[in-house]
Amino acid sequence: MERYMIHLKNNGYHQVHSSELVHRARELCSDMHASIRVARVASKFLEFDVSVNPDNLGMLIEKLSPIGELDNTRHVVEEKIEKEAGIKDGIFYFNNERFWESHESLEGVWKKCYGKEKELVQGIILLAVAFAHGQKDESNVGIGMLERALEKLGNSPAMYGNIDVDRIRNKIKEMQKSKGLTIFEI
C-alpha cells in the first residue's frame, strides 16, 4: 500500500465534522483493503490521508464520491528537492490550506538548514502543524503548539525569502491572545 492525500471539494463541512467524515469514509471503503488515517477540513476541500494499493486508488476515490467531488490527489513520497523549491512548495501548500503538505515540504528544507535558519524553518513547520490539527477539530492541540512555534522563530530576521516572519510572529501572538486559530497566508 502507498500513501496519498485525496482532496475532495468541500460542500459545507466544517472542522467539527472531521471525525464524522473519517468514519463515513471508512464505512464507504469498508469492503476494500485501504486505510483512512484522518480527515482534515479546509474551507475549499476535505483532505483524506489514506493508504491504498495504487491499482485500487481509482476505486477508493469513486467510493468517496458521496462525500464530495475529487479536487486532486497527491502521492506522498519523500522527494529530493532543492531548498528553494521546497520553500516555494511549502508556501504554496500553506497558502492553500494544505498544511500537512506544507509541513512535509518545509521539513525537507529544514533538513538542509543549520543554526538559526533551522530554528526559523522549524517554527514555520510548527505553525503549519498547528493549523493541520485545527483542521481535525483539535484546535486546543494547535493552540498549544503556537508557543513552541514562537520560540523557534525567536528573534530571527524579519524576512525569510518571501516569508514575512514578523507578520507570522504577530499573527501567532494574536491567536494566543484570542485562544483561537485564524488561518492566514504567509
Q: What spans do the regions from the language model cover?
A:
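N-terminal alpha-helical interaction modules that lie
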Residues: 1-96, 100, 156-186
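Inward-facing hydrophobic residues that define packing positions of alpha-helical scaffold repeats
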Residues: 94, 99, 106-107, 146-147, ...
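Short, charge-rich amphipathic alpha-helical segments embedded
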Residues: 104-126, 151-160
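Extended, well-ordered alpha-helical segments in internal regulatory regions
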Residues: 131-138
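TPR/TPR-like (Sel1-like) alpha-helical repeat modules
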Residues: 138-157
